[in-house]
Amino acid sequence: AKYIECDATALPFEDGSFDVTISNTVAEHIEPSMFYSEQLRVLKEGGICLVLVASKGVKVEADCLADSNFERRFWEKAAKRDNTIEKYSVGKYRMNEAQLPVIMQKYGFKDISTGYAVIDLTPDNPKYSAEMAREMINAERYSALDAISAVRRAIPQYFSAEEFEEMTRLANAKYDARLAQYDSGEKQWDTAVSVTLAVRGVK
């Protein structure tokens, strides 16, 4: 396998190079005419374009994971100062489940179809092993720590080192508490259900 980092609006491939193209949570960040025209260009006749987009899901947190006043103030301050979303057009071109098939057809694809993949991550569900349940909880921990690190990279000038350290400590303490609840059999039934829309079109 070969990995190439490139511009999705100017792919470094000849016309008609591929039988299938797959994009995973990319389309919502790129101007549609530029994105779909490139997908169409690099596909062979009869080739398949698959566009995967995160759809609405369900998120219910355990009480022990609720933000403290310190954390709420931190995130409110970060939201006011950080322009990363606007700067990089994050989610600027997001469309709903009805609009996506229409836009794919508009830019040249035919035989459009859709499907959904649903994944539920509920640590307390007995269908999951203890190892898997702990991995779910820790995955949320890593996501929380990554979010703090993202603020540190984007706007470090607005926060002290002590604030970042405290945010990290609080995040770890919360997820340590959640793991302790799981290990003691104290069920919380917190859950994260992700829904991914797959739109399929043919050149």
At which residue positions do the language-model features occur?
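Conserved SAM-binding strand-loop segment of SAM-dependent methyltransferases
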Residues: 1-10
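Conserved Rossmann-like nucleotide-binding pocket used by diverse enzymes
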Residues: 4, 22, 50
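Structured loop/turn residues at beta-strand edges in well-structured enzyme cores
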Residues: 6, 16, 192
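A short acidic, Gly/Pro-enriched loop at the edge of an enzyme's catalytic core
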Residues: 9-21
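A short SAM/SAH-binding and catalytic strip from SAM-dependent methyltransferases
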Residues: 19-33, 55
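A short glycine-rich, Lys/Arg-flanked "PGG" loop and its adjoining helix->strand segment in the class I
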Residues: 33-48
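Conserved catalytic/acceptor-binding region of the Class I
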Residues: 51-142
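Conserved Class I S-adenosyl-L-methionine
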Residues: 93-98, 113-203
